[in-house]
Amino acid sequence: MNSTNNTDSQNLDPNASEVEKLLDESAEAEEKVDDHTPPSELFILPLNKRPFFPGMAAPLLIEAGPHYEVLTLLAKSSQKHIGLVLTKKEDANTLKVGFNQLHRVGVSARILRIMPIEGGSAQVLLSIEDRIRIVKPIQDKYLKAKVSYHKENKELTEELKAYSISIVSIIKDLLKLNPLFKEELQIFLGHSDFTEPGKLADFSVALTTATREELQEILETTDMHDRIDKALVLLKKELDLSRLQSSINQKIEATITKSQKEFFLKEQLKTIKKELGLEKDDHAVDLEKFMERFNKRDVPQYAMDVIQDEMDKLQTLETSSAEYAVCRNYLDWLTIVPWGIQTKEYHDLKKAESILNKDHYGLEDIKQRILELISVGKLANGMKGSIICLVGPPGVGKTSIGRSIAKVLHRKFFRFSVGGMRDEAEIKGHRRTYIGAMPGKLVQALKQSQIMNPVIMIDEVDKIGSSYHGDPASALLEVLDPEQNKDFLDHYLDVRVDLSNVLFILTANVLDSIPDPLLDRMEVLRLSGYILEEKLQIATKYLVPRARKEMGLSAQNVTFQPEALKHMINNYAREAGVRTLNENIKKVLRKVALKIVQNQEKNLSKKSRFTITPKNLQDYLGKPVFSSDRFYEKTPVGVATGLAWTSLGGATLYIESVQVPSSSGKADMHLTGQAGDVMKESSQIAWTYLHSALERYAPGQPFFEKSQVHIHIPEGATPKDGPSAGITMVTSLLSLLLDVPVLNNLGMTGELTLTGRVLGIGGIREKLIAARRSKLNILIFPEDNRRDYDELPAYLKKGLKVHFVTHYDDVFKIAFPGV
């Protein structure tokens, strides 16, 4: 039930019309009886917003339901009075409240008029007459109650008259500040003679924004002096609030007026300057800027034609139009492209080699390729664009190599990542028809570098995505094709851009997820992980000095013992790259910096030099993160050690086999350890091959008769896949069958066929590094990988005994020398 000013009476409900007719008839009957005798029993209608006060005329919306039924009951009786009482809680449901949820004091009201509304509800015009108090509830269904009426004391004292004058004075002040009810107030004040202070108090508080609880308190106050005193307090609060609101409005209007005045003055000043020739209009400024730009560039004719057309178009547009902004932005991009500007290349091999060696340790094959690139550029009087893809684990220096290449060639460097990119518009730009459209990353690279032959690094190309917006990998096909990228077309510019002189460097962790057509356009250079000796050199020559400089320290403040760095590498940073190692070095230096500052504040200079040793390293880094890579110092029966290769570098892979009685009575094999489909097939091949060649390796031995063999690959939470564990699985099964342990410190890798041939695999360098880390000094590699092994540096192969095999017979002789 809500009060409202809506008087729309269209689409009248027939039942409501009938109620109105009956009420008119009952009104006539009631007037004939006694207009001055109020009924002692009233139907009560709950209110939940604000209470009404005597002397008011107010509309009330009656919704379909029990309250509408009350109207019908009143229409059938000789009475047209109802009671209006406020609920105790504002959020109470007025259709479902009981007497215990209502205040005891309310008002009686006479129904003057009903205006039916579509949907079974009606708007009722009420005349509020007297205060009432609920004496005794009669029924709960329609909230009918026995009520008593409060009669006002008509005695007018001098004090009440003074109160009335104060109230009228405040109301007049309110009129000046808030003219919303000006007409109604003037009518009321014109008829007010101060002889009815109670009515004046009720009317005045009804005008305020007081809370429902404050208004209900006024309604329940029957003593005239107390009521008019409380009304005066509420009016003064309302006056203070209106003054504050008026002050805020005046400040806002003053600010707006000042801003408008400044705007008009600036516009007048601008117009005067233009008339005097002291200032140019926006058209002239923009056109002059664009002319100045492309006059400094060697713009191709096809681009010049587009620029000229757009400049002619810009002159015809109003500066305030949306099309002007679109055209200006388009010209801004067209003229900011460094047409014909190329940086001068340097082809000094000695200087290039010096820079590469200074920035990076090892990576000889990568450095060799860069020097070849420089040599070709020197002989050909200019270097055409190349596409190089650096593949390797995280933290091995792929991004920093890209920066070094740009430094060696004296070119600008721009890097962006396509990891997770799903919209081809990021590469080729958005159409100009879209709001906020802009060119793709490649044109942005040209803008930022301001040359047409920068080094652009496209990072994480193996993690590129696709969606309904397009396939960014397919968009890169045109970019990375030397035969096509000379005419690269960005969707936003819609003008051909020559990218043939750009040197593209891409980085990836693995090649498996890169589409073959894209992979075919790249020259792949692999960066393997680092061994202990390499990490030690990198930490000593690069990471520690750089971190010390960042922390504001020097070699006089802190030094690392080589054994401490080795301990850190083996126990805290056992990864393919050096990113975690670098973070650990910085962590140590931060703690050292804290101690130095604390000592300085305590004036203790004697402990300003710190040496990091294996013994005190744990004080800085906490407990070691890694234990030994080896699960077994001495290999038990049924266990063979393989070598694996992942996107994070090389790792050891243990294959464990155990034999249990079979419930089916047949020989059976079961594989666990998050093995992928290819590895599952390798286990089946190993099982079948061993079964077929059993007499060769274990003559007279039954093949796991009435047993189930369980093969497990530890670290079961890590997914594993690939064919290179074939010979390792056969060796594990043979060890279990013969009850003979595999040769200790032996690691192996190789794909097995059903006939026992051992095929080549990938990641020889990574697997060799993993073997050195796990202290496996006897290795078995396929014969097909001998050439890969021979190309490795001597320090990697030092101390290792490597056997190359073509058939599993060779593996058997090495793994089980005593059989």
Curated annotation (Swiss-Prot):
Where does the Lon N-terminal domain lie?
42-239
The record's Pfam families line, in alphabetical order, gives:
AAA, Lon_C, Lon_lid, LON_substr_bdg
Where does this polypeptide localize?
A: Cytoplasm
Alphabetical UniProt keywords: ATP-binding, Cytoplasm, Hydrolase, Nucleotide-binding, Protease, Serine protease, Stress response
Q: Where is this region: Disordered?
A: 1-40
Composition skew (Polar residues), residue ranges: 1-14
Where is each Lon proteolytic domain found?
634-818
Q: Which residues form the active site?
A: S724, K767
| Protein role | ATP-dependent serine protease that mediates the selective degradation of mutant and abnormal proteins as well as certain short-lived regulatory proteins. Required for cellular homeostasis and for survival from DNA damage and developmental changes induced by stress. Degrades polypeptides processively to yield small peptide fragments that are 5 to 10 amino acids long. Binds to DNA in a double-stranded, site-specific manner.
- Say which family it is in: Belongs to the peptidase S16 family.
Name of protein: Lon protease
Q: Which organism is it from?
A: Chlamydia trachomatis serovar D (strain ATCC VR-885 / DSM 19411 / UW-3/Cx)
Taxonomic lineage from the root: Bacteria, Pseudomonadati, Chlamydiota, Chlamydiia, Chlamydiales
Gene symbol of the encoding locus: lon
